[in-house]
């Protein structure tokens, strides 16, 4: 199937959302959550995939495990990476992705290994993100955000792994991401978006500093806890890349370093994402084990963010996939029965919730 044809009818550059849908949208209560949505990409396509689950253990990709949105139709580099999804207080769904095709030359999209000179701007250099917003997971608005244009004085070399969370104190959606300035080390920053989720409206600020300035950090993932505090999972390239944790009483700073790694891998991993099991006081940390072939996701579970239980990898333990392999850098959110049923029906997936 031609990837470009997948997108036609699903998303164009900007889709005008129905006023009646947006006006009636609200954040569901936990008792109404009945399903899970996994968003991910893979290396062969650099495109966006969706997978649904009834129980948070077994996931089935929609659209016969083909992309639901082709990277070459939505990204300036003709490929996306690192998709993240969250739900805002307005009931809308927010997806943020890295605008980067690592194999762009191989795919025939450019003549050079990277978009800009590798010696000056480093590995995987790019210019920004793809931001999307929807009230029904089917019709989306889209904006291509070039960080280097918004902040030309920063000499941005790369901007990766954007994630979105609502900052109640600022009453804005906060985008936090990995950024490298010039050919320096990657660090983690945050900035606020406009209400339409089309651009950034504040100067990027550091959200966390690793104790050793020579160690690169990336891929932050922030989870609000019931007591009002926040936990950040992130990657420290301290030896093999590993998942570490920091905690704070505020969303956009003050995170306290903890030395122990959280993942159970011998090799390198990245892309942490924490999600809560519906109706339970349990959280699952998912991460991308990129040091193995084929690539796979690993999982650990916790009730207190102090003690962690290893759940293994997809199809090696309790976590399963039914129709897809080698997912990369994903995120999971909970859905209501109505939302999951609507999405499954749209993509012709015979699954009830």
Annotate each predicted stretch with a short phrase.
Residues 1-10:
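Bacterial N-terminal signal peptides that target proteins for export
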Residues 9-19:
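Bacterial N-terminal signal peptides
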Residues 21-353:
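Carbohydrate-active catalytic/glycan-binding domains of CAZyme proteins
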